[in-house]
Amino acid sequence: MPVKEKAALLVPSGTYHEPDKKHLHIICSDPDAKGLVVIVGISTYTNDLCDQTCVLQAHEHPWLRHQSFVLYRKAEIVSAAALQARIQSGEVLECDEVNAQTFLRIKKGLCKSPQTKRKVKRYLGC
């Protein structure tokens, strides 16, 4: 699967206690002329201190097991080629795309969230 908007990936994000843990990440843009894309992670919703911009329910993606939220503060602009290399090496795993409605909520949230970095917002034209 090529690196493109709506693609969902499982990216290594383990902790000291769970080094093999992976979190769902969503690619939020197609590669630009420089081959860059925006990617954002999804994390477990634990309390009301989590970013409320885009809260997801377990039924919104097969990988989600419980209520989650989009971790806009860690949104990044990354090289699509580097991401593709990580996929080909098996470090990053591909999974089912996000449905169109959920993806729209995630993408709109990049501009709405107060936690999205300024450089990501500028890149997206927010």
What residue spans do the PLM features occupy?
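Loop/turn positions that initiate beta-strands
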Residues: E5-A8
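Mixed-charge, Lys/Arg-rich low-complexity intrinsically disordered regions
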Residues: M1-V3
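C-terminal terminal-subdomain/extension
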Residues: E60-C126
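Generic structural signal for residues positioned in beta-strands
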Residues: L10, V38, V55, F69-L71, ...
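Compact nucleic-acid interaction/catalytic patches
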Residues: P12, H17-W63
